[in-house]
Amino acid sequence: MKEYKSVCPYDCPDACGLILTVDDNKVTKVRGNKEHAFTRGILCPKMAHYERVIHSPKRLMTPLRRIGKKGIGPDQFTPISWDEALERIVENFNHTINTYGSESILRYSYAGTMGAVNSPAADYFFRCIGATSQDRGICSPAKQAAFKSVYGDTVAIKPQEAQHSDLIILWSLNATATDVHILHDVNVAKRNGAFVWIIDTHKTYTYDQGTHHVYVKPGSDGALALGMIHIIHRDGLEDTTFIQAYVQGYDELVRDVLPTFTPEYVSSICGVPVEIIEELAHAYAKAKAPFIRLGSGVSRYGNGAMSCRCINALPAVVGAWQHLGGGLLSSSSSSQYFNKSFMQQPNTPTPSKRMMPMILLGDLLTNPKALLEHGLEDTSGGVPVHSLYIFSSNPAITAPNQNLVRQGLMRDDLFTVVHERFFTDTCAYADIILPATSSAESDDIFNSYGHYTIAASYQAIPPVGESKSNWQVISELAQRMGLDDSFFAMTERELIEHMVRNSSKLSQDEQDAILRGDLVEVALPDNYKMDFKTPSGKIEILNPRESIPLITYTEPYGDDEPFWLIIGNDIRILDSSFCELEFDDSELMKLRMHPDDAALYNINNSDAVEIYNNRGAVRIKVYLDDTVQRGTLVTLGVWWQSQSSDAKVGINAVTASRPTDEAWGSTFYDVQVNIRKV
C-alpha cells in the first residue's frame, strides 16, 4: 500500500489537494491533503469517492469503431486496436485536408481536465495541420472580460482574505456546490461577527450560510449594483478620497447614469423590495472591509459582461481595496506563475484565421457560413467541417442549442473521433472512440482559478485497460502525421519540468518543491491589491476602449415565453461529469415551480410536464416549491440523456447559442420557456 499526492482535475475553482491510497495498482481511497493552503484537507461530495470513477465498470477499456447507426448507443460499436484506430484517424485527416482543405478539421475540447499539459494538449497539433481553431471560452469569459475592463491585469485578491471581512457578499455563487472551500473563510469571518449576504436568482444549497438573502430576477444583477451605488452616493457614503486617487469615471457615472437608478426603478427591474435594496447598500457602504465573491452565473446572460462590470465597480466606490479583507474575487491569477504558454508553442505556426467560438458548434456543423453570418473572420470562405476531434468535453449534452448540435453530429459526411473515459452522449455519434485515462493514470500540473496554490500530480496507477492520456494520443497522431517536431516527443513529466523551470515568477525553492510533488502557494507582491494594472493606473469604471465606455445597465436577451428557466448546479455532478456514477434518486432531472404559477396551468405536484420554446422541448417531472420566484422555473444539473425524464434530450435542448455582450461566452441562463402538462 502506498500514498500519492494528487490534485482534483475537474473544472472547479478549488483544485483540491488529494491523497490517493494505492494497493495492488488500484486506488482504494481518496482523501483531502491537509497541507493545502485553501482546501485544507476537505473534499466535496463529488470527489470523496473518486476511486469509484477511476475503477468504474463503465470505463471504456479499448478503442471502438462504429459499425452501426449514429446516435444509438454502445451496441453500434466494435473493439479495435490502437493501431487501427490511429491509422483510421490519420487516413481521414489526410483525406480531409487533400479534398476539402485543412480548415475542414475542427477540434472541440474544454475542461474535462484542467491540467496544464492535458487540457491544451491538442492546441499546437491542430495548429500545425491548419485546422479550424476553437475559442475555448464557454463558461465565464464575459466575467473575465469584465474584470479586465475595470481592473486590467491587476492581481486578484486571495480568497483567504475573506476571513478578515466584516461583510461578505456571495453574489451568484452557490458555493456549497461549486466553491465549497471559500465557506471555511466565510465561517471564520462569521465567527468574528461578519454578515453574509447571498444574492442569487433562487434558493440554493448555500442558503444556510447566509445571514441575509436577496433574490433577483434573472439578468438584473447589474441594475442592483447600480442601485446600490446610487444610494451610496445619495447618502454620501462613498470614499471620495479613494475615488479621486484611484477611480476613473466616477464623476461621469454620477452625472450620466446614477440619477436613473433610483431604488424604486431598480426594484421594478430586479424584483427586490426597495427597503432591501436600501439595507444592502447601507450595509455594504458602512462595512470596513466588504468582500464580494462573484460567481459565474451572472455572466451567462446576454448582458453578462456589463452586469459584472457594474458589480466590479462596487469595491471601488467604497474604497474596499485599501483594507485587509476588502475587495472582490472574480477569479484568481495563478496561471501566470509558471510557463503554461509553452504548450501553445506561441512562436511557431500561427492559428488559422477561422476560429469557432464554442457556443457555435451546432451552428457551424449545420451551416458552413455560420461564422461569416455572425460577423466572424473565416478565410476559408465557409468550408464545411468534415472531421471533428472531441476530447475533455461532452457537447451532445453540454453545448447550447442541443438539437442543432445533434443534427450536426448526425451528418453522414462528418467523421467524428471522441476521446473519453465513459460512453457519454457524444460517444453515440462517434466513428472512432478512444479510451482516456483519469488523472490518477497520467502526469500533469495544476493551477487554480480560485486560489494561488500550484501542484504537480504524478501518475499513481497504470492506465486502466488500454486508456491513454490526451497528450499521449496527440503525440502519436503527430508522429503518424509526419510532424517532425521535438515538442511532440516530450513526455508529460518533461513538459511539466520545462514549464516550471522556465518561470521567472517562481523561486528555485518553489520550483524544486513543485517538481517534488509538494503544494506551493505562490507569494503575491506587497500591496498587490492597490497596484491597479490598467492603462490609466486607476480602476476604470469608464473604459474608453469599450464599445460602451461607462458602466450602465443593459438588458438580457430573454425570449417570448412566460418563464425564466434557471439551470442551477447539482451538488452531485459538475456539468455532465460524474453522471457515470450510480445515484439512489430515481428522478435525477427535476423541475421546481412556484405553486401559484402551477395553479394557473392546472399543474399539480409531481406531474409530468414539458417545457418548451422555439429551440426544443424537454419532458420533466415538476415539484411545487414556494421558495421559487414567481415567473421562474428551476432545475439542477446537466444530466446525461439516459438520466433525463424521457431519455430523449437534455436540458440544453431549450438553451440558445447566442453570445454574451463580450468575449463570446455562453448564455445558458438567458433562456425563457413555456410549460404544459403531458
Each predicted region: which residue ranges?
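N-terminal export/assembly segments and adjacent metallocofactor-ligating motifs
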Residues: M1-D235, P273, F391, A599, ...
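Short beta-alpha connecting loops at secondary-structure transitions
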Residues: D208-V216, T437-A440, Y452-V464, D584
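Flexible glycine/proline-enriched surface loops and loop-helix/loop-strand junctions
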Residues: K69, Q209-G210, F261-Y265, R293-V298, ...
